[in-house]
Amino acid sequence: MTLQDMQIRLKQAFPDAEIEVIDLTGTQDHWEVFVSSTLFTGRSRIEQHQMVNRAFAEELRTGEVHALSIKTLIRKE
């Protein structure tokens, strides 16, 4: 996935989010994502990370995304 693909996917899953995506190795398969969204309100950190992982479930399954480091924050309205 490209950087733009990652950003689009996150925006689709979290329309209100502030997002930052970093390609950790330059190989487009090791990523770090920062997502701040109101959709995380009332959810545990594990649930927040599961939500982000679901956005990339197929790519993680096939190995297109090999590593995904996730940082989440509950965004205030």
Where are these regions (language model features)?
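Charged, low-complexity, helix/coiled-coil-prone segments
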Residues: 1-3, 28-30, 67-69
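Short hydrophobic/aromatic beta-strand micro-patches
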Residues: 34-36
